[in-house]
């Protein structure tokens, strides 16, 4: 059997979104048939034939062309054409081009999604990729797949709902409404609905339907902006529904309570942390994602939680890698939040294996090693399940910029690199950020003297050294002198004293300078 020719047609008008496919097939030597398939986009298509018995090529070609022309005359368009569907009067969902100006990769993904699960075995990958890219052009195909999803197929629906959270418009809200009450998918549907509503409008109605029912126990305290009371209630109840409601509410008094729940969660409350971790990953909330990931990572490993703990370690890296591969603008904020969550005190004793390998101090922190050392030649990921990293017997070389995962994406966000320098508590992470920033002279010039002084005063020792390096390149000012005098970096003290010795008249004329020299470290 050989397909000689085929046509992929589709029709979109108002709420109608249909597909019609025609194939001219050679079933034997000089014997041909014309088959067709039709149905709503994304669903299993019905099939049929226009030739009950095989015919000659000339006759089959005539039947094929006639059927294609008939469908085109009825409003069908070629499947690879750029089409602006005609909206129905008053239709709020069809307000402009659906396929126009869509990136080529998104067009390929949409085409595969439109073929449905029966004809496209890579659908789960395409759904995840659509979620990562977050383009609205994928919404119609995702909705069709969701409508055709069996009530018992919660696993596939759990992939489609996050994709709609990033690709959906107001059209998706009505389709997600039925999932809000689902025991298995309700939390995902609530989160997706809130994300869409915040993006396209209608947050008040969606909040009342999806979030408010979960907050009855703390609503008076939220109304009073009493974060202390909210924390007390949330940590005493330790309810998944309440914690999810607080997180989705976005209320200023709610977030400290959610963080407190994560930090105080015991072995019996880990399901709450796992749910928050997934919601934070869906919303690309770097801070909460990192807090939950580190909490899971820091739990004492037992036979009951070891498998889940290792799974979440791998999932953290998988989330970051997908964002990086898509060149997503969310990669750098998520990665920065993860690196800010590690400290020098997280180091563990160095271990040596029987085959000469060395497990360094931060070997078990999969996300940390992935972000800083993914492209490093002398550091390797160990077994898949444990995800620990080890090095050869030659010792670990100094960190280089190209060793990190997606260095080009880091270079696009010097503000986050500077944040990592100022707020980081891990030498390796700060060293990486400083190395990346050194070549960005334009951004470094925009850093104020106050910021440099604060970093020299309160930053990590590595950050103080980096800030002092650039402070030296500037004209001395009382602000820089204040930071250098309070720094733990000895050369900074020497710099201030040497400048004062060379400019005694300036020091004598300024009470600020005298105070700095008297009170400085």
Question: Over which residues does each language-model region extend?
Answer:
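A short, charged, amphipathic alpha-helix used as a generic interaction element across diverse proteins
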Residues: 55-72, 431
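Structural detector for internal amphipathic alpha-helices that build alpha-solenoid repeat scaffolds
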Residues: 121-134, 144-147, 155-169, 178, ...
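Amphipathic alpha-helical scaffolding segments comprising HEAT/armadillo-like alpha-solenoid repeats
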Residues: 99-113, 135-148, 169-181, 201-216, ...
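Generic helix N-cap/helix-start motif at coil->alpha-helix transitions
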Residues: 106, 116-125, 150-159, 170, ...
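Extended alpha-helical scaffold segments
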Residues: 203-211, 217-405, 409-419, 423-428, ...
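Intrinsically disordered, low-complexity charged/polar segments
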Residues: 73-108
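Short N-terminal "domain-start" leader segments
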Residues: 1-32
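Short aromatic-glycine-(Arg/Gly/Cys) micro-motifs in beta-strand/loop hairpins
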Residues: 21-51
């Amino acid at each position: 059997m050989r397909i000689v020719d085929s046509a992929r047609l589709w029709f979109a008008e108002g709420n109608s979104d249909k597909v019609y496919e025609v194939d001219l097939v050679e079933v034997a030597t000089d014997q041909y048939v014309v088959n067709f398939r039709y149905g709503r986009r994304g669903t299993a298509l019905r099939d049929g034939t226009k030739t009950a018995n095989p015919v000659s090529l000339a006759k089959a070609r005539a039947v094929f062309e006639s059927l294609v022309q008939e469908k085109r005359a009825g409003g069908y368009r070629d499947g690879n054409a750029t089409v602006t569907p005609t909206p129905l009067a008053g239709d709020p969902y069809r307000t402009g081009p659906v396929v126009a100006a869509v990136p080529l990769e998104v067009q390929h993904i949409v085409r595969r999604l439109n073929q449905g699960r029966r004809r496209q075995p890579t659908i789960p990958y395409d759904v995840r990729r659509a979620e990562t890219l977050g383009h609205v052009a994928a919404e119609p195909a995702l909705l069709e797949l969701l409508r055709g999803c069996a009530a018992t197929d919660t696993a596939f629906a759990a992939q489609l709902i996050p994709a709609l959270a990033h690709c959906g418009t107001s059209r998706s809200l009505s389709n997600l409404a039925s999932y809000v009450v689902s025991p298995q998918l309700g939390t995902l549907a609530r989160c997706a609905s809130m994300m869409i509503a915040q993006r396209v409008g209608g947050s008040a109605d969606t909040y009342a339907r999806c979030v408010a029912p979960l907050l009855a126990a703390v609503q008076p305290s939220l109304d009073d902006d009493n974060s202390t009371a909210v924390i007390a209630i949330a940590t005493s109840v330790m309810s998944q529904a309440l914690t999810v409601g607080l997180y989705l509410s976005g209320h200023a008094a709610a977030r400290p309570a959610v963080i407190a729940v994560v930090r105080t969660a015991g072995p019996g409350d880990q399901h709450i942390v796992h749910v928050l971790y997934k919601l934070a990953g869906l919303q690309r909330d770097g801070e909460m994602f990192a807090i939950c990931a580190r909490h899971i990572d820091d739990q004492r490993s037992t036979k009951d939680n070891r498998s889940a703990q290792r799974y979440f370690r791998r999932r953290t890296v998988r989330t970051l890698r997908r964002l990086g591969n898509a060149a997503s603008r969310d990669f750098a904020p998520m990665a920065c939040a993860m690196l800010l969550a590690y400290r020098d005190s997280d180091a563990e004793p160095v271990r040596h294996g029987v085959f000469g390998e060395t497990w360094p101090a931060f070997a078990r922190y999969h996300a940390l090693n992935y972000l800083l050392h993914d492209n490093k030649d002398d550091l390797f990921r160990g077994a898949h399940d444990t995800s620990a990293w080890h090095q050869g017997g030659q010792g670990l070389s100094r960190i280089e910029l190209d060793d990190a995962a997606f260095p080009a994406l880091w270079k696009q966000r010097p503000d986050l690199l500077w944040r990592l320098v100022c707020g980081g508590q891990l030498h390796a992470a700060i060293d990486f950020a400083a190395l990346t920033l050194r070549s960005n002279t334009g951004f470094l010039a925009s850093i104020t003297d106050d910021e440099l002084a604060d970093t020299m005063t309160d930053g990590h020792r590595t950050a103080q050294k980096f800030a002092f390096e650039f402070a030296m390149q500037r004209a001395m000012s009382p602000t820089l002198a204040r930071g250098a005098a309070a720094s733990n970096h000895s050369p900074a003290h020497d710099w201030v004293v040497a400048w004062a010795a060379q400019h005694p008249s300036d020091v004598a004329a300024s009470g600020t300078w005298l105070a700095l020299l008297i009170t400085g470290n």
